[in-house]
Amino acid sequence: MKIKAVLNRDGGTFKTTDMQTYCESATRAFAAKGHELVCDVVPGAEIVDALESASGEAGLDALLAGGGDGTISTAAGIAWKAGLPLGVIPAGTMNLFARSLKLPLDIWKVLDLLAGAKVANVDIATANGRPFVHQFSAGLHARMVRMRNQMDFASRIGKIRASTSAAFGVMLDPPRFEVVFDIDGDGRSDERPISAISVSNNPLGNNSLFFADRVDTGKLGVYLAEPLEPTGVGKLAFDILRGKFKENEAVTASTAERVHLHFPKYRKGAACVLDGELLRMPPDVEIKIHAGELKVLVAPEQPTA
């Protein structure tokens, strides 16, 4: 197989990695399995162009992407549109999609697995046509990300500290807004006040990091939190930390294949988060699951005794 690896040298672990040595190790690992790997290391500002350029190369059989969740989300959308299998090298802070794919989270150990991987079909979702592999969210999460982005941090530990500080800030002043939602186009729109909404690519698992245990169910996870006071946000945060947020009395959980969201009291400057990226929120959001349309590299099945 002819494979191209595009690595974000500004992404998490790669900031402190000798990238020449890493690419040499990757090339050897794939050559040992009979593959031809070309490694391209680029700064974060050039990652989108590099991924798009790689996806258009003639004769390419698979695309590898290395970086944080933002890089992987971008790569997934590009690979999906190009019809290429995507290999994930988890070099970020959370590495949520890599966790869902049950990949090693060590950038060195994952090379041997990807070199001998099989291709699997998993789901990808879109929000107003924009692909994502983790989640769309508004309310509590968006406010926290906005506050975190206003802080200075230059390392993984710094980002975690900034996130913790932002979480406390949101806890003291939780948002409240109206949403009208229609699930699966059944025509029964429901309007309610909430403090948070999250729509995930597959239902989230019982874990504290908010990632899906599987990404091949063909369903979105839909989660709404009713209007919360600071004490309610604190209780929700505690339930999230122990991996039991769906048991929180303020949370309503369901699944769907398509969700339409309308924000009747939309105001300019309102924000949402899509796979960790803070974006301006439109007044209407159409979210769809594209079941089995993304090809990914995963661990080969182990023979049974």
Model-derived regions, located:
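ATP/NTP phosphate-donor binding region
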Residues: 1-62, 73, 77, 303-305
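ATP/nucleoside-binding phosphotransfer catalytic cores, i.e., glycine-rich phosphate-binding loops
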Residues: 16, 185-187, 191, 224-305
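Glycine-rich phosphate/pyrophosphate-binding beta-alpha loops
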Residues: 137, 198-211, 278
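A generic structural signal for short beta-strands and their flanking turns/coil linkers
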Residues: 175-177, 193-195, 216-221, 255-257
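N-terminal glycine-rich "phosphate-gripper" loop used for MgATP/nucleotide binding
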Residues: 65-70
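Catalytic core of DAGKc-family lipid kinases
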Residues: 4-6, 15, 24, 33, ...
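Short, well-ordered alpha-helical microsegments
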Residues: 47-48, 72-73, 206-207, 281
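Gly/Ser/Thr-rich active-site loops/lids in small-molecule metabolic enzymes
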Residues: 150-161, 208, 212-232
